[in-house]
Amino acid sequence: MAQMTMVQAINDALKSELKRDEDVLVFGEDVGVNGGVFRVTEGLQKEFGEDRVFDTPLAESGIGGLALGLAVTGFRPVMEIQFLGFVYEVFDEVAGQIARTRFRSGGTKPAPVTIRTPFGGGVHTPELHADNLEGILAQSPGLKVVIPSGPYDAKGLLISSIQSNDPVVYLEHMKLYRSFREEVPEEEYKIDIGKANVKKEGNDITLISYGAMVQESLKAAEELEKDGYSVEVIDLRTVQPIDIDTLVASVEKTGRAVVVQEAQRQAGVGAQVAAELAERAILSLEAPIARVAASDTIYPFTQAENVWLPNKKDIIEQAKATLEF
């Protein structure tokens, strides 16, 4: 075991897979020589060579097309889109081509592509860098969408993503890259895609979240417990597919649920979770399912995001309203 940041854990996972399977290739803008904008791939090109870890032109659609071509010819590509907001430039390749390859080929051609990309607020980026587009990607049939909330999950989920025979979008929250460390095994391990994690057990209310909002939810739970409430916190880990069974089991116990997301409220992951819980656990509910989310506006850039992003205070206020309903 070693203490790692999320950057280090992701780098370690990539290194592990490059060693394990010579068909794994890592590429994207500035991924090779510079080790990526956030130095996530630092040192990999030097260790594994330019044929396996390499830079691409600044053309997201080309990166996606290259990944698909490599995948259907036997490779296991790990492509990086420099920031999630740039996925608009490669959306056809990702959702219209890569995601549909197995279906189009009648199951004869898998597309084992891992699409890595940073996203999320809290680091004051320019426009189109921090956008939360996980809801759009989760609505694209054929894609799995994974969002780790810390270093341990980051390594295990990335290894599972790379070894998957279907395409996985692996979203890395920028605020979490170096914000804290966790004990991470140095050997290979996998975390199942599609399985949520109960981060904290409780009996009065369930907070459901993913990515950086998991940390905010845990902070909120700590404050709520000072007021005598027992709070369960669940990390989705994967927003496509969603582990509804774990969520239903929790809500059947607590009777109350608040879904927390950083993204805009409209048509988000939180709306899907709320709908599923309403369909499957409504008789167990003692209060309406609540959501904490950002405003339905274009993602603000730099300092403006400070008043836009949901935070611990918002979660506490909504949780108390739900508890007192």
Curated annotation (Swiss-Prot):
Keyword Nucleotide-binding: no
CDD domains found in the cross-reference section: TPP_PYR_E1-PDHc-beta_like (cd07036)
Keyword vocabulary terms for this entry: Oxidoreductase, Pyruvate, Thiamine pyrophosphate
GO molecular function (one): pyruvate dehydrogenase (acetyl-transferring) activity
Record field: catalytic activity: N(6)-[(R)-lipoyl]-L-lysyl-[protein] + pyruvate + H(+) = N(6)-[(R)-S(8)-acetyldihydrolipoyl]-L-lysyl-[protein] + CO2
Binding site for thiamine diphosphate: E60
Enzyme kind, highest EC tier: oxidoreductase
Required co-factors: thiamine diphosphate
InterPro entries named in the record: THDP-binding, Transketo_C/PFOR_II, Transketolase-like_Pyr-bd, Transketolase_C
Presence of the UniProt keyword Glycoprotein in the record: no
EC number, UniProt record: 1.2.4.1
Superkingdom in the source lineage: Bacteria
Subunit structure: Heterodimer of an alpha and a beta chain.
Function: The pyruvate dehydrogenase complex catalyzes the overall conversion of pyruvate to acetyl-CoA and CO(2). It contains multiple copies of three enzymatic components: pyruvate dehydrogenase (E1), dihydrolipoamide acetyltransferase (E2) and lipoamide dehydrogenase (E3).
PANTHER family in the record: PYRUVATE DEHYDROGENASE E1 COMPONENT BETA SUBUNIT, PYRUVATE DEHYDROGENASE E1 COMPONENT SUBUNIT BETA
The protein's name: Pyruvate dehydrogenase E1 component subunit beta
Organism in which the protein naturally occurs: Staphylococcus epidermidis (strain ATCC 35984 / DSM 28319 / BCRC 17069 / CCUG 31568 / BM 3577 / RP62A)
Gene this protein is translated from: pdhB
